[in-house]
């Protein structure tokens, strides 16, 4: 009897423990394993590859729009339509610019930004795939910088990321921005002032190039600038009958330019300054009562840019005093020198090397070599190797890009993706030739893969974000803090290029790419790829 009671007690005790254990298992959820970063990157590449046709269509469509800075209405409508259709929340007209917008998906931290430019170049109209000068519309704007490809890169990357975030329940936010009027260096300082980047953890920029590369620090061939228009006001009179009654605003413009040109000898070698007269009066027999000149003052750092700007103001006031006119000025745009983040660049470089260069075929190389020969540059075709990480070098000065203002407010890099031909002059019809061809399509697809992979590195690894900000705070901005070059009362010059686009838009619209009828823009234009001189 005792033995039976013992076994009964043991059975009940074991049953109680088992029930308690099962209850405990039910109340404590199993730990969800962390996502496999490498597996997600492979999945991102697969998703991007599925959008090869979308990439080509975006590159070709934006090429066909050919819109100048501040007039990118069709371009912005097209891009935001694609993003909205794919579940992104759009905010239009940001920072006081009708063609500016943001597109967001997700919630919470980290917040990863994507930015790339969308405007084109005056007088750069060119038939794609034709290795000599042959404009689509004579005198019209064209994508002679290749900005038509960047939004394909960032949009395709963002859509791929969204799919992965939904599927794998990944936390964080991705947000896209357009580089409006970059060729005027006229908007990103206003974006900063409007607070568009205040919550960003990392910004991933992209820009067309002939190489696959990234860098950190200040690029060797980069300057900051301030863009200023000086407006002189005089008094009109009959230029022959009573010139003594007039006060020539044009005389003031000319004296300012003469004074500046004499002063150049006594400026630092690193400075670059240039001007165009945007209003020289109406006709010779009327003393000009109004005249304007537009200056770019470029230097290597904020103090020297500010110094040039103040010197320009002094020259303008002196010219006004000499001619008994008055002067005022307006800052049209500005750019801090670029400074890119070491941590973000090192992470991005690994992804560039993982993706590798596109595979160019004989037609791609034939176009590249024929164009290089046509313009008498070095004939070497397209690059076939990834560029090693570009480390800081002594700045020498050069072109300017207003992403510099962003780079001094949030850790940022610029992916240079291989969608164009080496050894071209830039800002010209030559640079438009490859930009709606398989060269641009392949390079943009490769760029989208790197953007998506790099975003995953920061979405899934908080340590990367932490290290990026450590570099930003303890190295980049340790001694230099961002100060805007635009004033509190300055506003975006959204009226610029309106007249030029009004002239060419009706003809351009007739030639917008129609992907429902044509496989690509080359087919629509009836261009054999490549078309080269015999």
Which residue stretches match the model-derived regions?
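Bacterial Sec-dependent N-terminal signal peptides
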Residues: 1-23
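Acidic/His- and Gly-rich active-site-bordering loop/insert found
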Residues: 22-143, 152-172
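Divalent metal-coordination and catalytic microenvironments
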Residues: 62, 83, 103, 114, ...
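Short Gly/Pro-enriched turn/cap motifs at secondary-structure boundaries
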Residues: 92-93, 182, 218-222, 393-398
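Acidic-glycine-rich active-site phosphate/pyrophosphate-binding loop
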Residues: 119-133, 221-231, 420-428
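Histidine/acidic-residue-rich, glycine-tolerant segments that coordinate divalent metal ions
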Residues: 133-142, 148-149, 165-288, 506-519
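Metal-dependent amide/peptide-bond hydrolase catalytic core
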Residues: 254-534
């Amino acid at each position: 009897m005792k033995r039976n009671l013992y076994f009964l007690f043991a059975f009940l005790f074991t049953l109680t423990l088992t029930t308690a254990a099962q209850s405990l298992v039910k109340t404590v959820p199993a730990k969800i394993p962390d996502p496999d970063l490498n597996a997600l990157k492979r999945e991102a590449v697969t998703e991007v590859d599925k959008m090869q046709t979308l990439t080509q269509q975006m590159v070709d469509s934006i090429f066909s729009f050919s819109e100048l800075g501040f007039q990118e209405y069709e371009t912005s409508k097209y891009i935001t339509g694609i993003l909205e259709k794919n579940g992104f929340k759009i905010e239009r007209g940001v920072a006081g610019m009708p063609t500016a917008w943001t597109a967001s998906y997700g919630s919470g931290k980290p917040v990863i930004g994507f930015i790339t430019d969308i405007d084109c170049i005056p007088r750069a109209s060119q038939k794609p795939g034709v290795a000599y000068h042959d404009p689509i519309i004579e005198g019209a704007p064209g994508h002679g910088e290749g900005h038509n490809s960047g939004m394909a890169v960032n949009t395709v990357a963002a859509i791929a990321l969204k799919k992965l975030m939904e599927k794998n329940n990944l936390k964080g936010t991705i947000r896209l921005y357009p580089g409006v009027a970059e060729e005027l260096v006229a908007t990103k300082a206003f974006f900063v002032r409007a607070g568009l980047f205040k919550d960003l953890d990392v910004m991933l920029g992209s820009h067309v190039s002939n190489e696959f590369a990234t860098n950190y620090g200040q690029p060797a061939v980069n300057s900051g600038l301030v863009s200023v228009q000086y407006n002189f006001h005089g008094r009109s009179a009959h230029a022959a009958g009573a010139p003594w009654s007039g006060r020539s605003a044009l005389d003031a413009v000319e004296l300012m330019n003469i004074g500046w040109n004499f002063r150049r000898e006594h400026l630092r070698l690193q400075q670059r300054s240039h001007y165009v007269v945007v209003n020289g009066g109406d006709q010779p027999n009327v003393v000009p009562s109004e005249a304007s000149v537009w200056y770019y003052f470029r230097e290597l750092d904020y103090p020297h840019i500010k110094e040039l700007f103040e010197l320009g103001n002094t020259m303008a006031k002196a010219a006004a005093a000499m001619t008994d006119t008055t002067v005022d000025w307006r800052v049209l745009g500005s750019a801090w020198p670029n400074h890119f983040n070491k941590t973000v660049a090192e992470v991005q470089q690994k992804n560039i090397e993982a993706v590798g260069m596109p595979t160019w075929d004989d037609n791609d190389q034939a176009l590249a070599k024929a164009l290089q020969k046509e313009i008498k540059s070095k004939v070497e075709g397209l690059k076939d190797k990834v560029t090693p990480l570009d480390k800081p070098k002594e700045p020498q000065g050069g072109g300017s890009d207003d992403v510099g203002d962003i780079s001094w407010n949030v850790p940022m890099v610029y992916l240079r993706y291989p969608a164009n031909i080496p050894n071209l002059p830039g800002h010209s019809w030559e640079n438009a030739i490859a930009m709606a061809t398989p060269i641009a399509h392949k390079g943009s697809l490769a760029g989208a893969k790197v953007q998506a992979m790099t975003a995953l590195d920061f979405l899934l690894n908080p340590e990367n974000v932490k290290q990026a900000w450590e570099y930003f705070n303890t190295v980049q901005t340790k001694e230099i803090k961002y100060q805007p070059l635009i004033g509190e009362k300055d506003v975006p010059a959204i009226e610029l290029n309106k007249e030029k686009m009004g002239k060419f838009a009706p003809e351009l619209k007739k030639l917008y790419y129609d992907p429902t009828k044509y496989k690509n823009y080359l087919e629509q234009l009836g261009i054999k790829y490549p078309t080269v001189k015999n």
